[in-house]
């Protein structure tokens, strides 16, 4: 009987140390999520239930090539970090298996990539997220995915400015060729 009591303190001490290491790891993960929420320009939450490993890996490769950081976290730990940063409205989207895509360089890239892949893979569901430090719903995230990226917007602006000048130059060239005006 005394033997069992002498083993018990050792057993509980070891178990307590193991639980403390798990708790430390969870605190580190919450700090990592907290840092990502503060330093990224956007966040898109996507549910990936039913996707194969190959489909998920392909999605992650697309994220990586676009400069988007994608991670899978436990919803409870993400919820704690979101509350710490004042994003209380995200809690409704934190159900089921979620992939968190953080836009580090282009704020629209995560939503764009998810929307593009959701057309090919209907099991991929774009949920809410964060854009411009505001919590957005799934519908708003879908609208954001339709916006042009920064480089696309600049290209559209440049072509819009260049088109009238091209037409003017072409018209003047025709008038010169017909010799209605002199150069």
UniProtKB/Swiss-Prot annotation:
<comment type="function">
    <text>Forms part of the ribosomal stalk, playing a central role in the interaction of the ribosome with GTP-bound translation factors.</text>
</comment>
<dbReference type="GO" id="GO:0070180">
    <property type="term" value="F:large ribosomal subunit rRNA binding"/>
</dbReference>
<keyword id="KW-0689">Ribosomal protein</keyword>
<protein>
    <recommendedName>
        <fullName>Large ribosomal subunit protein uL10</fullName>
    </recommendedName>
</protein>
<dbReference type="Pfam" id="PF00466">
    <property type="entry name" value="Ribosomal_L10"/>
</dbReference>
<keyword id="KW-0694">RNA-binding</keyword>
<comment type="similarity">
    <text>Belongs to the universal ribosomal protein uL10 family.</text>
</comment>
<dbReference type="GO" id="GO:1990904">
    <property type="term" value="C:ribonucleoprotein complex"/>
</dbReference>
<comment type="subunit">
    <text>Part of the ribosomal stalk of the 50S ribosomal subunit. The N-terminus interacts with L11 and the large rRNA to form the base of the stalk. The C-terminus forms an elongated spine to which L12 dimers bind in a sequential fashion forming a multimeric L10(L12)X complex.</text>
</comment>
<dbReference type="GO" id="GO:0005840">
    <property type="term" value="C:ribosome"/>
</dbReference>
<dbReference type="InterPro" id="IPR022973">
    <property type="entry name" value="Ribosomal_uL10_bac"/>
</dbReference>
<dbReference type="InterPro" id="IPR001790">
    <property type="entry name" value="Ribosomal_uL10"/>
</dbReference>
<dbReference type="InterPro" id="IPR047865">
    <property type="entry name" value="Ribosomal_uL10_bac_type"/>
</dbReference>
<dbReference type="GO" id="GO:0006412">
    <property type="term" value="P:translation"/>
</dbReference>
<dbReference type="InterPro" id="IPR043141">
    <property type="entry name" value="Ribosomal_uL10-like_sf"/>
</dbReference>
<keyword id="KW-0699">rRNA-binding</keyword>
<keyword id="KW-0687">Ribonucleoprotein</keyword>
């Amino acid at each position: 009987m005394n033997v069992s009591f002498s083993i018990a303190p050792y057993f509980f001490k070891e178990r307590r140390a193991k639980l403390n290491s798990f708790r430390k790891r969870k605190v580190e993960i919450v700090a990592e999520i907290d840092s990502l929420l503060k330093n990224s320009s956007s966040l898109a939450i996507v549910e990936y239930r039913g996707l194969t490993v190959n489909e998920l890996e392909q999605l992650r490769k697309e994220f990586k090539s676009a400069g988007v950081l994608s991670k899978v976290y436990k919803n409870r730990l993400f919820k704690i970090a979101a509350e710490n940063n004042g994003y209380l409205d995200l809690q409704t989207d934190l159900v089921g298996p979620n992939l968190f895509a953080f836009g580090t360089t282009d704020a629209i890239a995560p939503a764009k990539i998810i929307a593009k892949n959701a057309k090919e893979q209907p099991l991929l569901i774009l949920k809410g997220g964060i854009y411009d430090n505001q919590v957005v719903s799934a519908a708003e995230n879908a609208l954001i995915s339709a916006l042009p990226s920064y480089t696309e917007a600049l290209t559209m602006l440049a072509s819009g400015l260049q088109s009238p000048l091209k037409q003017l130059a072409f018209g003047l060239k025709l008038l010169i060729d017909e010799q209605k005006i002199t150069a």
